[in-house]
C-alpha cells in the first residue's frame, strides 16, 4: 500500500476527550488468534533449491495472510470504530505470527548460505522474509505495538478543531481545515486552524510515540539494524545514501532560497511588518498548507503576471460539472493512452473516492492499496474537485498502475525503491498540469506560450515542487534522530522546529514548547510512513520526465512536455514498473535514464527560466536570501482567538467599500434634503419626515456597519479600505434597539426644536427670538438690567425646558457609545482625533495660552469696572457673564467700544461702512467667494446660490438660525444656512462657513466615508484662516471697508485687541464645554449637579459668574446650541489653535514679511495650493499628515497664536502692571448678589451660593471646594505674576507638539 505524498495531507483536529483518550490507552489488547496450520512453513532443504521451494510456498501463504490483514486495515480506515480497530489488531497479530514463523524458519535454514545464492532474485526474497520487524517482539509487546499504531491512527483521523465558544462548529482535517489553510487569508483564522490542529493531535500523540519508538527500535535491532531508521534506509541499498541526499539538497538549495525570498516579500505586502520579517523565517501557517510543505494554494497572491490566463483550472472543473469519479476516469485515460493498463472492475466497485456522507469517521489521507490477490486494487481519497486534487488523483493512480504491472512478481518483490513508487503518478501529473494538456482535456480555452505565461506556470509548479524539497528532506532527518537517540523525547519539539527553521526558513506562529508534539500533527508520523521517499521522488520524477519526453519525441523546453498518448514513453515506463524490486533500483534507473544515480540536474533544467526570473526579482528588491534573524517570531493578533471568523480578503473589502459608497450617497442625500427642509421651515410635518429619514439613515448605518464588522482590517495593505471600514464599523446611534433609537431621535429633535423656536417676551407683550433680537441686544446694549433680563430670560425659557430631556439623552448617547466599544460617549467623541494623549495635549495647549487670557481678563474687567462701577464689577473677582457682549460670554468683540486701548485711533469695525455702502448678505458671500478664488481655489457652484438660505426668511417661517454649512453628497450641491446680519462679525462668520464649503468641494471626489476634515478642528479652521486675512486693516481697506490700512502702533494694538476679544476670549469657553460634557458622560457629574458643575468650570477657566441666582432647576448649558444639538465642541478649541499655525505657514508661503498679524494671503496661489492639497486629503490620512502638508510638521502648537498676539501681550503686561491688576479672580466667591448671598433666602431654608439657589448642605460642600480652588488659584496667581513679567523679555515662540481644531459654527455635514 503506497501512501500519497504528505504534501497532500489533511487539516485541523480536536483532541479526543480525556476519557476517550484514557480508554484508548487502557483498551486491553485483543486475544491472540491462532494461525491456520496450513499457512505455517513446512520442511525445506537448507540449500538454494530448497530455498526456491521455500519462497514459492511462502508466496502462496503470504497472499492469503496479507489479503486478510489489508482487508481489516481497509475496513478500519474507511469506518473507524472500536470493533474495526480490534479486528485490525487481531489481523496484525496473525500477520506478525506468520512473519515470525516464516522469518525464523528462513534464518534457521538459510542464514549461513543465502547471501551466496546464485539467483539474485531469490536472495532478495529470502532477505525480505528473514526481516521480522515487529514480529521479533514477544506477544505482549507485539500487542502493545499494534495497539499503539491503532490508537495513534485513531487520534489523528478523528481529531477535530472547534470554533471558539461554539461547541456545534467543529472542523475535521479534511476537508475543513485543509480548505481554511488553502483559501483563508485571515492571519488569525489561519493561526487558529494551525494551532488548533497541532494541539489537538500532537499533544495526545507524544506519549504514544515515545512508546512506539522504543518498541520499534527493539524489534529492528533483532534483525541486525542499529535502529528503525537504519532499517528504513536499508531499502535504498546504498551505503552513501545520506551523503547523496545531502549533496542533492545543497544542489537545490539556491533555488529554494530564491523562491522563499520572493514569497516572503509578497507575504510582507499582504500581512505587513508586524507578521513578516524580511530577514527572518516565515510564520508556518501563511503558506497555504497545514505543514507549509507545498505553497501552491497561495499562487493567487504571488502570481508574477496576474493579467495572464489563470492556470488554476479549479473553477472550470466545477463549471463543467466534474466530480470525483470523472477525475479518476480522466487519470485512467492518461495511463491507457500510454499503452498502460486500465483499472480493474474491483477498483471502481470497492474504492472510496469521496468522503462518505453517512457520518462515518474515516482516514481521509489519500492512499493506494494492494490487496495481494492480483486483482483487488483500491484508492481511498476524500476527493474534492480542484486542480490540486487532480494531481493527487494521478499520483494515487500511479501507485495502482505500479501494483498492476508487478502483480505477477513474488509478494516479496511487489514493491520498489519507495521513491520510485511515489514518482510514477507525479511523472504523469507533470504532463497533466501543462497548459497544453489542460487545453486538450477542455480545461483551458487557449494556450499562451509567451515568456510571462511560462513564468506564471513555472512559479506555480515551483510552489508545489521546490517548496516541498526542504520539508521532504527534514521529516526523516528528525525521525532518524529520534530513532538513534540523538533527539530524546525531552527535545522532540525543539529539534523539530530547529530543522524546520534551518531547512525551510519557517517558524511557529505561536509559542511552542515540549508539551507540544508538532511533528505528530503530520500524518506520516503517527501512521509510521517513512518520508524520505518523497524527497527522492521529487528528484526522480524529473529524471523520469526528461527520459520519457525524449522517448516521446518532445522538442522544446522540458516544462512544456506532455507525454499524453505516447506509447513509446508508456513502454519505457512499463519496464520500470514491471520490475518491482526484483532488481537493484540503480539498474532499473539506468535502463530508464541512462544513469544509475539520483541527479537533480533535470529538475534544475525544468525550472531554469523561473530560477533566473526569481534571481532578477530578488536582486531588484534587494532581498536577503535566507533568514539571518532566525530567532524572530511574530506576535499574536489582537483579539485572538475571538476574532478569527472575520474576513481578511481585501478584494472583498474593496467590493464592500464600493457598494457602501454607492448606497451612502443616495441615502444621505435624501436625509440631507429632509434635514434642510426641517431646519429652514420647522413644522410638525417636516419633523415627521426628518424622523423617518433618520430611521432610514440608522438602518443604512446598521446594515453596512454590521457588514463592515465582518472584516478584520488589521493587516490590510490598502490604507484607504482599512480606514473606511474602520470608520463604518462604528454604528453610532444606529446600534441602539429600534424603540430606543426612535425615542433618542425624538429627544434630539425635541431639544433642537425647543432651542430653535424659543422666544422671550417683555411685559408689554413683545417677543424676541435669539436671532437676531437677543443676540443684537447682548451685543449693543450697555444697560446692566436690560442685559440681565435678556440673559436670564433666555436661560429660563430654553435651559429649563431642555433639562427634562437631557438625562435620557445622556443615557442613550452613552449606551450607543458602549455598544460601539467605547468606554462612554466622551471616549467616542475623542476617538475622532486618533490621538491617545488628546486630553493631556489639550490641557498643555490651554496652559500655554492661559497667561494671555488672564491678562486680557484683567484688562477687560478694569474697563467694565469703569463703565458699570464697583457695585457690579469686583476687580479681584469673576466677571458677571452677561456683560461681555455675547449670550455665552464666549467672544467679547462686541464690547470693543468699551475696552479699545486707543479710542481716538480710527475704528477697526467695518460694520458702518458695510451698511453705508449697501452691502447685503449675498454681497458678503460673494466677497468671501472672491477671496477663495483669488487663492486659486474653487468657486461655489450655481446650486449654492440657488439653494442656500443666506438670510432669515421674512415669510414667518420658523428656522434654525444657527449658521451651518451643508454637503448633500452628490458632488455639486453645497449650501449655507445663516441668518446673516450685515456687520463685521457676520462677515467673519461668512468666511468661516465658506471655508466648510471649500473643504466639501475639495474632497468631493473621495469615497464618501472620507469626505470629512482631517479631524473636526480642521474643518472649523479653514474659513477662519481666511478670516484672519480678511480682518486685517490692509484687506478691509483693499475692499473699501476702511479708509486707511492703519499701520501705526496704536492701530496695531487696537486691531490685536479686537482680535483677542474674539480669539483669546474664546479659548477657555471652547475648552470647558466638552470638559463638562465628558464628565457628564463618564458619570463624575450627575444630573443633580449639572448646573453647579457647569458654573464651577466657567468660574475655573473663564473667571465668570452668573449674574443672577442659579439653582439645580436651571440648566444653563442647555442654553448653548451645541448642547441640545449634541454637537461636540472641543473642535472649536482645536480650530482656534491650528488656524494660527495654518496662517503662519500660509503667510510664509505667500512671501509675507513683517508681524504675523499684518499678513493678508489674498491672491497668493502658493498659499492656496498648500491649503487645497491639505483639504483634498479629507479624512483619508491621519490629521498629522494633513498638518504636515500645510505647516511642514505634524504637531499642534500654540506658539503661532502667541506669536500673533505678542505685541498685544507686551502691551497688556505693561498696562496691567501700571494698574497693579491681580491676575485671576482670588475673590472667586463674589457674585453681583453677594449682599444677598451672605444669609439664607427668606422663608426657604436655602442659601444663595455662587449665584445659585442651593440647600445649606450643598452650599457647605461648595464652600470647601471653592476654598481649595482659592488656595490653588492664589498659588497659581503668584506663580503666573512672576512668569508673566519674565515673558516680556523672552520670545513667546516656544516649540510645541500636540493636536489641532476650529470655530464657533456648527458643521452639519456628518
UniProtKB/Swiss-Prot annotation:
Dipeptidyl carboxypeptidase that removes dipeptides from the C-terminus of a variety of circulating hormones, such as angiotensin I, bradykinin or enkephalins, thereby playing a key role in the regulation of blood pressure, electrolyte homeostasis or synaptic plasticity. Composed of two similar catalytic domains, each possessing a functional active site, with different selectivity for substrates. The active site is at 396 (proton acceptor 1), 524 (proton donor 1), 993 (proton acceptor 2), 1122 (proton donor 2). The modification Phosphoserine is found at residue 1303. The record marks 1236-1237 as: Cleavage. Residues 34-1260 are extracellular. Residues 1-33 form the signal peptide. It is a single-pass type I membrane protein. One of its GO terms (cellular component) is extracellular region. Residues 1282-1310 are cytoplasmic. The chain crosses the membrane at residues 1261-1281. Changing residue 727 to E: No effect on activity. 20-fold reduction in catalytic efficiency. N-glycosylated. This is Angiotensin-converting enzyme. The keyword Oxidoreductase does not apply. Belongs to the peptidase M2 family. The dipeptidyl carboxypeptidase activity is strongly activated by chloride. Specifically inhibited by lisinopril. Inhibited by mixanpril, an orally-active drug used for the treatment of hypertension. Zn(2+) 2 binds at residues 992, 996, 1020. Its cofactor is Zn(2+); chloride. Pfam families: Peptidase_M2. It catalyses: Release of a C-terminal dipeptide, oligopeptide-|-Xaa-Yaa, when Xaa is not Pro, and Yaa is neither Asp nor Glu. Thus, conversion of angiotensin I to angiotensin II, with increase in vasoconstrictor activity, but no action on angiotensin II; angiotensin I + H2O = L-histidyl-L-leucine + angiotensin II; bradykinin + H2O = L-Phe-L-Arg + bradykinin(1-7); substance P + H2O = substance P(1-9) + L-Leu-L-Met-NH2. GO terms for biological process: angiotensin maturation; bradykinin catabolic process; hormone catabolic process; hormone metabolic process; kidney development; positive regulation of systemic arterial blood pressure; regulation of blood pressure; regulation of synaptic plasticity. Zn(2+) 1 binds at residues 395, 399, 422. Residues 1219-1260 are annotated as: Juxtamembrane stalk. The lineage of its organism: Eukaryota, Metazoa, Chordata, Craniata, Vertebrata. Monomer and homodimer; homodimerizes following binding to an inhibitor. Interacts with calmodulin (CALM1, CALM2 or CALM3); interaction takes place in the cytoplasmic region and regulates phosphorylation and proteolytic cleavage.
Amino acid at each position: 500500500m503506497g501512501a500519497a505524498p504528505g504534501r497532500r495531507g489533511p487539516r485541523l483536529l480536536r483532541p479526543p476527550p480525556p476519557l476517550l483518550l484514557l480508554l484508548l490507552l487502557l483498551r486491553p489488547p485483543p486475544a491472540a488468534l491462532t494461525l491456520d496450520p496450513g499457512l505455517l512453513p513446512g520442511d525445506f532443504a537448507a540449500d538454494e533449491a530448497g530455498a526456491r521451494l521455500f519462497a514459492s510456498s511462502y508466496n502462496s501463504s503470504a497472499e492469503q495472510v496479507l489479503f486478510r490483514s489489508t482487508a481489516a486495515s481497509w475496513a478500519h480506515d474507511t469506518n473507524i470504530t472500536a470493533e474495526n480497530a480490534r479486528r485490525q489488531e487481531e489481523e496484525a497479530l496473525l500477520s506478525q505470527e506468520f512473519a515470525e514463523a516464516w522469518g525464523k524458519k528462513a534464518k534457521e535454514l538459510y542464514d549461513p548460505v543465502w547471501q551466496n545464492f546464485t539467483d539474485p532474485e531469490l536472495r532478495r526474497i529470502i532477505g525480505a522474509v528473514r526481516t521480522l520487524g515487529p514480529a521479533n517482539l514477544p506477544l505482549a509487546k507485539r500487542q502493545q505495538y499494534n495497539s499503539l499504531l491503532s490508537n495513534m491512527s485513531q487520534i489523528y483521523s478523528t481529531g477535530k478543531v472547534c470554533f471558539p465558544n461554539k461547541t456545534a462548529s467543529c472542523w475535521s482535517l479534511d476537508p475543513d481545515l485543509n480548505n481554511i489553510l488553502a483559501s483563508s487569508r485571515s492571519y488569525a483564522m489561519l493561526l487558529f486552524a494551525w494551532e488548533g490542529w497541532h494541539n489537538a493531535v500532537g499533544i495526545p500523540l507524544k506519549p504514544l510515540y515515545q512508546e512506539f519508538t522504543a518498541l520499534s527500535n527493539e524489534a529492528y535491532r533483532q534483525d541486525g539494524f542499529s535502529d528503525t531508521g537504519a532499517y528504513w534506509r536499508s531499502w535504498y541499498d546504498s551505503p552513501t545514501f545520506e551523503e547523496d541526499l545531502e549533496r542533492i539538497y545543497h544542489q537545490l538549495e539556491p533555488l529554494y532560497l530564491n523562491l522563499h525570498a520572493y514569497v516572503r516579500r509578497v507575504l510582507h505586502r499582504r500581512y505587513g511588518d508586524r507578521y513578516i520579517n524580511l530577514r527572518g523565517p516565515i510564520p508556518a501557517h501563511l503558506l497555504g498548507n497545514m505543514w507549509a510543505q507545498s505553497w501552491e494554494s497561495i499562487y493567487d497572491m504571488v502570481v508574477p503576471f496576474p493579467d495572464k490566463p489563470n492556470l488554476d483550472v479549479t473553477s472550470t472543473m466545477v463549471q463543467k460539472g466534474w466530480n470525483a469519479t470523472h477525475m479518476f476516469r480522466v487519470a485512467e485515460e492518461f495511463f491507457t493512452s500510454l499503452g498502460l493498463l486500465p483499472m480493474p472492475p474491483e477498483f471502481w466497485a470497492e474504492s472510496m473516492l469521496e468522503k462518505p456522507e453517512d457520518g462515518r469517521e474515516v482516514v481521509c489521507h489519500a492512499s493506494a492499496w494492494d490487496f495481494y490477490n492480483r486483482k483487488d486494487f483500491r484508492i481511498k481519497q476524500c476527493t474534492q474537485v480542484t486542480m490540486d486534487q487532480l494531481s493527487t488523483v494521478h499520483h494515487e493512480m500511479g501507485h495502482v498502475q505500479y501494483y498492476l504491472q508487478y502483480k505477477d512478481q513474488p509478494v516479496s518483490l511487489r514493491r520498489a525503491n519507495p521513491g520510485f513508487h511515489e514518482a510514477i503518478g507525479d511523472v504523469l501529473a507533470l504532463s497533466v498540469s501543462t497548459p497544453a494538456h489542460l487545453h486538450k482535456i477542455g480545461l483551458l480555452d487557449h494556450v499562451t506560450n509567451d515568456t510571462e505565461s511560462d513564468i506564471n506556470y513555472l512559479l506555480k509548479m515551483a510552489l508545489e515542487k521546490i517548496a516541498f524539497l526542504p520539508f521532504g528532506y527534514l521529516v526523516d532527518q528528525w525521525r532518524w534522530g529520534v530513532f538513534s537517540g540523538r533527539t530524546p523525547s525531552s527535545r522532540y519539539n525543539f529539534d523539530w522546529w530547529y530543522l524546520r527553521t534551518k531547512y525551510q526558513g519557517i517558524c511557529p506562529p505561536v509559542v511552542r514548547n515540549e508539551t507540544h508534539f508538532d511533528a505528530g500533527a503530520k500524518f506520516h508520523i503517527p501512521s509510521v510512513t517513512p518520508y524520505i521517499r518523497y524527497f527522492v521522488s521529487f528528484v526522480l520524477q524529473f529524471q523520469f520526465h526528461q527520459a520519457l519526453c525524449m522517448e516521446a519525441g518532445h522538442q522544446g523546453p522540458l516544462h512544456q512536455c506532455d507525454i499524453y498518448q505516447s506509447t513509446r514513453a508508456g513502454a519505457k515506463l512499463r519496464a520500470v514498473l514491471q520490475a518491482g524490486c526484483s532488481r537493484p533500483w540503480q539498474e532499473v534507473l539506468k535502463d530508464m535514464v541512462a544513469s544509475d544515480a539520483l541527479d537533480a540536474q533535470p529538475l534544475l533544467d525544468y525550472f531554469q527560466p523561473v530560477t533566473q526570473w526569481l534571481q532578477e526579482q530578488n536582486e531588484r528588491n534587494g532581498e536577503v536570501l535566507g533568514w539571518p534573524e532566525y530567532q524572530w517570531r511574530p506576535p499574536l493578533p489582537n483579539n485572538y482567538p475571538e476574532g478569527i471568523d472575520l474576513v481578511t480578503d481585501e478584494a472583498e473589502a474593496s467590493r464592500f467599500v464600493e457598494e457602501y459608497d454607492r448606497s451612502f450617497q443616495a441615502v444621505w442625500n435624501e436625509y440631507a434634503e429632509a434635514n434642510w427642509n426641517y431646519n429652514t421651515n420647522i413644522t410638525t410635518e417636516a419633523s415627521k419626515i426628518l424622523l423617518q429619514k433618520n430611521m432610514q439613515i440608522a438602518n443604512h448605518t446598521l446594515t453596512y456597519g454590521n457588514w463592515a464588522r465582518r472584516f478584520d482590517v488589521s493587516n490590510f495593505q490598502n490604507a484607504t479600505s482599512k480606514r473606511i471600514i474602520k470608520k463604518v464599523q462604528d454604528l453610532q446611534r444606529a446600534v441602539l434597539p429600534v424603540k430606543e433609537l426612535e425615542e433618542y431621535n425624538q429627544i434630539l429633535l425635541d431639544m433642537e426644536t425647543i432651542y430653535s423656536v424659543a422666544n422671550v417676551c417683555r411685559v408689554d407683550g413683545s417677543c424676541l427670538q435669539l436671532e437676531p433680537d437677543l443676540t443684537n441686544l447682548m451685543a449693543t446694549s450697555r444697560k446692566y438690567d436690560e442685559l440681565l433680563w435678556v440673559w436670564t430670560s433666555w436661560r429660563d425659557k430654553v435651559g429649563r425646558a431642555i433639562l427634562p430631556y437631557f438625562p435620557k439623552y445622556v443615557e442613550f448617547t452613552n449606551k450607543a457609545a458602549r455598544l460601539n466599544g467605547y468606554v462612554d460617549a466622551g471616549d467616542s467623541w475623542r476617538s475622532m482625533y486618533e490621538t491617545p494623549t488628546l486630553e493631556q495635549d489639550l490641557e498643555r495647549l490651554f496652559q500655554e495660552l492661559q497667561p494671555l487670557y488672564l491678562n486680557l481678563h484683567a484688562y477687560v474687567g478694569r474697563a467694565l469696572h469703569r463703565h458699570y462701577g464697583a457695585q457690579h464689577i469686583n476687580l479681584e473677582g469673576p466677571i458677571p457673564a452677561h456683560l461681555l457682549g455675547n449670550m455665552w460670554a464666549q467672544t467679547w468683540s462686541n464690547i470693543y467700544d468699551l475696552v479699545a486701548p486707543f479710542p481716538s485711533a480710527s475704528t477697526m469695525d467695518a460694520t458702518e461702512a458695510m451698511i453705508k455702502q449697501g452691502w447685503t448678505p449675498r454681497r458678503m458671500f460673494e466677497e468671501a467667494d472672491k477671496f477663495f478664488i483669488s487663492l486659486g481655489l474653487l468657486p461655489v457652484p450655481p446650486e449654492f446660490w440657488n439653494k442656500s438660505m443666506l438670510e432669515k426668511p421674512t415669510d414667518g417661517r420658523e428656522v434654525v438660525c444657527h449658521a451651518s454649512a451643508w454637503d448633500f453628497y452628490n458632488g455639486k450641491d453645497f449650501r449655507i444656512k445663516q441668518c446673516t446680519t450685515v456687520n463685521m462679525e457676520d462677515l467673519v462668520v461668512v468666511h468661516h462657513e465658506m471655508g466648510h464649503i471649500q473643504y466639501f468641494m475639495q474632497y468631493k471626489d473621495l469615497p464618501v466615508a472620507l469626505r470629512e476634515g482631517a479631524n473636526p478642528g480642521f474643518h472649523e479652521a479653514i474659513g477662519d484662516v481666511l478670516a484672519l486675512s480678511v480682518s486685517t486693516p490692509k484687506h478691509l481697506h483693499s475692499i473699501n471697508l476702511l479708509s486707511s490700512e492703519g499701520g501705526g502702533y496704536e492701530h496695531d494694538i487696537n486691531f490685536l485687541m479686537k482680535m483677542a476679544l474674539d480669539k483669546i476670549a474664546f479659548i477657555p469657553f471652547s475648552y470647558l464645554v466638552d470638559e463638562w460634557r465628558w464628565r457628564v458622560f463618564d458619570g463624575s457629574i450627575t444630573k443633580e449637579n449639572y448646573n453647579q458643575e457647569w458654573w464651577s468650570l466657567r468660574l475655573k477657566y473663564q473667571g465668570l459668574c452668573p449674574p443672577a441666582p442659579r439653582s439645580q432647576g436651571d440648566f444653563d448649558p442647555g442654553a448653548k446650541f451645541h448642547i441640545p444639538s449634541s454637537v461636540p465642541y472641543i473642535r472649536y478649541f482645536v480650530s482656534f489653535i491650528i488656524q494660527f499655525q495654518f496662517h503662519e505657514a500660509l503667510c510664509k508661503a505667500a512671501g509675507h514679511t513683517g508681524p504675523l498679524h499684518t499678513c493678508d494671503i489674498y491672491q497668493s496661489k502658493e498659499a492656496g495650493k498648500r491649503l487645497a492639497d491639505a483639504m483634498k486629503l479629507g479624512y483619508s490620512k491621519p490629521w498629522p499628515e494633513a498638518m504636515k502638508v500645510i505647516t511642514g510638521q505634524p504637531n499642534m502648537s500654540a506658539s503661532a497664536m502667541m506669536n500673533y498676539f505678542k505685541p498685544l501681550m507686551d502691551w497688556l503686561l505693561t498696562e496691567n502692571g501700571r494698574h497693579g491688576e491681580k491676575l485671576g479672580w482670588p475673590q472667586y466667591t463674589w457674585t453681583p448678589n453677594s449682599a444677598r448671598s451672605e444669609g439664607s433666602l427668606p422663608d426657604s431654608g436655602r442659601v444663595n451660593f455662587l449665584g445659585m439657589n442651593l440647600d445649606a448642605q450643598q452650599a457647605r460642600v461648595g464652600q470647601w471646594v471653592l476654598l481649595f480652588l482659592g488656595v490653588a488659584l492664589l498659588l497659581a496667581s503668584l506663580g503666573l505674576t512672576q512668569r508673566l513679567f519674565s515673558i516680556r523679555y523672552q520670545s513667546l515662540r516656544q516649540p510645541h507638539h500636540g493636536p489641532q481644531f476650529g470655530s464657533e459654527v456648527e458643521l452639519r455635514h456628518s
